Amino acid sequence: SVMITGASSGIGAALARAFAAEGANVALVARRPDRLDQVRRDIEAAGGRALVCACDVSDAEGLRAAADQTAEAFGGLDVVVANAGFGVSGCLEALEMEDYRRQFEVNFFGVIATVQAVLPHLIRSKGRLGVVGSLAGCFGSPTTSAYNASKAAVMSLTESIYHELDEHGVSVTCINPGFVASEIRSVNNQGKYTGNPDPVPRWLVLPAERAAADMVRALHRRKPVVFIT
């Protein structure tokens, strides 16, 4: 069984469909139950099985409940992908400290909360953990200091826990995508969906389904790191 955070759209939804197509039972975790229900219906229409767990990754108790519910429903938990995140943008002088805190609360501390929630189940199954970083964590660029810093922190965290969890038989894969088709660039600094068009040229953007296929392959192979471009 597989649990994916940020599963209501973009990479998360594509991952859910990809795992379900392989026959995995999938738990869908995100804030928007209506969008999760749509992904669930898509999976079930294709003959798969999915469970909806409406939860924000800033809610540690909710994440633990989602992990326990998934393990109970599917008889264990084998793969978890910590994918939930959003992007704060703006020049340093224009952003408030609260903007940086909000960015790290979801992108960094949300990953920690997710890992802590699922870890007992993954240790039991000697499973696989995927953490979605970003190519943006490898460099700096104007107006994205909050997002880039949060993803750099995620990449460093993932490298550290890779070594910690290896002794438990749990593999950790740091997944670093470039531009992938998703709603992340249509979300404002408060994490709210705006519906604005993606400003990145379409020829630079990888289809979510293709990115998800590469990510699933890396998780099956228990690769420590993968770059998706």
Label every model-predicted segment.
Residues 34, 54-65, 97:
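The beta1-alpha1 cofactor-binding region of Rossmann-like NAD(H)/NADP(H)-dependent oxidoreductases
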Residues 134:
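Residue(s) in the substrate-gating loop at a strand-loop-helix junction
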Residues 115, 150:
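Active-site helix of classical SDR
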Residues 167-229:
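SDR active-site lid
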Residues 22-38:
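Conserved glycine-rich Rossmann-like NAD(P)H-binding loop of the short-chain dehydrogenase/reductase
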Residues 8-9:
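Conserved glycine-rich cofactor-binding loop
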Residues 91-92, 96-101, 126:
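Substrate-binding pocket helix/loop in short-chain dehydrogenase/reductase
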